[in-house]
């Protein structure tokens, strides 16, 4: 069987459940908060792994507590993330405010995702599919 190779972003998603999305300059009290593994690259890799694909992931995290949570999540899968790079800055993250209807607003901070060193990425042997997405620098995708 051919391998699936994902080169992409890893984010820790901070999801705040709220009665509604605040208006400009307004603060409201949220109902709950969740910290969820995310990033398009990370989500693609985990989904492929959960569906039985032999999956490799190349990406970049920072040297912060979010990086520890992200790598711990990957350790609980069979995704090979030995190509994961570690930078000195902040890991990627997003903050989403989700209202009861499901509508949401979000902001993404790419952090170390923007500093993936494409020259140090080696495509694993027997790779049949390469997945890329737009949460990383275009030069990495090229």
Regions picked out by a protein language model, each given a short descriptive name:
Residues 62-63, 88-89:
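Conserved beta-strand edge residues that scaffold enzyme active sites
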Residues 1-58, 65-68, 138:
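Glycine-rich phosphate/adenosyl-contacting loop at the front of the ribokinase-like
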Residues 48, 74, 95:
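Hydrophobic/aromatic pocket-lining and membrane-interface residues
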Residues 61-62, 74:
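Extreme N-terminal leader/targeting regions
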């Amino acid at each position: 069987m051919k391998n699936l190779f994902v080169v992409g972003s890893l984010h820790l998603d901070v999801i705040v459940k709220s009665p509604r999305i605040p208006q400009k300059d307004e603060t409201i009290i949220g109902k709950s908060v969740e910290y969820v593994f995310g990033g398009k690259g990370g989500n693609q890799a985990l989904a492929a792994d959960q569906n039985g694909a032999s999956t490799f992931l190349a990406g970049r995290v920072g040297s912060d507590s979010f990086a520890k949570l992200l790598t711990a999540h990957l350790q609980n899968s069979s995704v090979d993330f030995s190509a994961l790079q570690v930078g000195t800055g902040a890991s990627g993250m997003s903050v989403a405010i989700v209202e009861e209807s499901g509508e949401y607003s979000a902001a993404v901070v790419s952090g170390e995702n923007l500093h993936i060193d494409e020259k140090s990425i080696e495509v694993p042997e027997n790779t049949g599919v390469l997945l890329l997405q737009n949460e990383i620098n275009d030069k990495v995708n090229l």
